[in-house]
A protein has these predicted regions:
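The feature captures the conserved acid-bearing segment of alpha/beta-hydrolase catalytic domains
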Residues: 15, 110-124
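Conserved beta-strand scaffold positions in the cores of enzyme catalytic domains, especially
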Residues: 16, 155-157
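Short beta-strand/loop motif that positions the catalytic acidic residue
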Residues: 123, 129-131
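Hydrophobic, aromatic-rich cap/lid helix
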Residues: 90-112
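Conserved loop-alpha-helix segment in the C-terminal half of the alpha/beta-hydrolase fold
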Residues: 133-154
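Acidic beta-to-alpha connecting loop that harbors the catalytic carboxylate
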Residues: 132-135, 160-162
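Catalytic active-site module of serine/aspartate enzymes centered on a nucleophile-bearing elbow/loop
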Residues: 159-184
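Alpha/beta-hydrolase-fold enzymes
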Residues: 2-87
Length: 184
């Protein structure tokens, strides 16, 4: 979503491509698949702000959100797919938050009340959004695409692809389509 937010903010951007886009504000404020209620969000704010005070007092700052390892037997498919990418040679990096212990626990607090995609309907430049048909996150792109205006916007769903396939699977990443989009 950050690329769309940048395009909404800066008219100098001529074209934007997103691939397996995440709406970080939405997932932090509403949970995966919009599973959180207003009461859940309130409880989240209470917990995180209490933690903020505790961390300030102790001077120690916690991290959270790295891909779980070892992988529990009941992990959802998308967590297994993340594990296959971030916890293996395929995508591991010693500085990657997902490969390791995540980001600062309080990082999500800023996203809860600051929806980054508020003005994407005002993007006048071209946008190509790419997502895998089998991606758990597909709804982020589909819903954001519905808010875009103009005939220079396209949503491309890649059959059979999951979220992480569009990170590094050279057989499914539509390089030709991306190149032709930027050449227009």
């Amino acid at each position: 979503g950050f690329a769309l937010n940048a395009a909404a903010n800066d008219p100098r951007i001529k074209a934007t491509v997103t691939s397996t886009m995440y709406d970080m504000s939405r997932v932090n404020a509403n949970g995966y698949f919009d599973s959180m209620s207003a009461d859940d969000r309130y409880d989240l704010r209470v917990r995180l702000n209490e933690r903020r005070t505790e961390e300030y007092r102790s001077g120690e700052y916690g991290r959270d959100g790295g891909v779980v390892d070892p992988l529990p037997d009941d992990a959802p498919l998308f967590v297994r797919q993340y594990h296959d990418y971030y916890k293996t040679q395929r995508g591991y990096h010693r500085r990657s938050p997902n490969s390791n212990d995540g980001l600062n626990v309080l990082n999500s607090l800023a996203f809860v009340n600051m929806p980054i995609l508020s003005y994407i309907g005002e993007i006048r430049s071209a946008v190509l959004m790419i997502h895998g048909a089998e991606a758990h996150s597909r709804y982020f792109s589909e819903d954001a695409f519905k808010r875009l205006t103009g005939d220079n916007k396209e949503l491309l769903i890649i059959p059979g692809a999951c979220h992480v396939d569009l990170y590094d699977n050279l057989d499914v990443i539509p390089f030709d389509r991306i190149e032709s989009f930027f050449r227009k």
